[in-house]
Amino acid sequence: MKKTPLLNIALSRVIASLGHGDILMIVDAGMPVPAGVELIDLALTRGVPDFVSVLDVVLSEMQVESHVLSNEMAEVKPPALQVIESLNLDDQLGQQRWISHEDLKVLSRKAKAIIRTGECQPYSNVALVSGVVF
């Protein structure tokens, strides 16, 4: 059995396969997933699992170079935003970029995979850009 926090087989496989610059998205329950992009659907019910729990586990395994958020997230300020801001202070998410929610949907077409959570707070979505550990 793995010793690290991440137990989900599909998610572990995707993170292990990421190369420099690949995009992995963590999204709320309402974010559409484009055809052809791998979906790792973790959603069980409203709020389970929540965005922050999934982000924490993903960050335990993934080197992040930068991340992309929607402008709407800054306006609505879901609880996930405070956590992301805290992670930024610790330099765990690299450079931050803001785009419109519609542009985030367009960017999702380039994602290697999208992780759907049970999060129901609007605009709780992030695109993580993979970095390297060397």
From Swiss-Prot:
GO biological process: D-ribose catabolic process
A Pfam cross-reference name: RbsD_FucU
InterPro entries membership: D-ribose_pyranase (IPR023064), RbsD-like_sf (IPR023750), RbsD_FucU (IPR007721)
Enzyme type, top EC level: isomerase
Major subcellular site: cytoplasm
Coiled coil: none
Keywords: Carbohydrate metabolism, Cytoplasm, Isomerase
SUPFAM superfamilies recorded: RbsD-like (SSF102546)
Gene3D superfamilies assigned to the protein according to its UniProt record, in alphabetical order: RbsD-like domain
Keyword Cell membrane assigned: no
Signal peptide: none
GO cellular component terms listed in the entry, alphabetical order: cytosol
KW Isomerase (keyword) present: yes
EC number: 5.4.99.62
Catalysed reactions listed for this entry: beta-D-ribopyranose = beta-D-ribofuranose
Its job: Catalyzes the interconversion of beta-pyran and beta-furan forms of D-ribose.
Subunit structure: Homodecamer.
Family: Belongs to the RbsD / FucU family. RbsD subfamily.
Name of the protein in question: D-ribose pyranase
Species whose genome carries this gene: Pseudomonas savastanoi pv. phaseolicola (strain 1448A / Race 6)
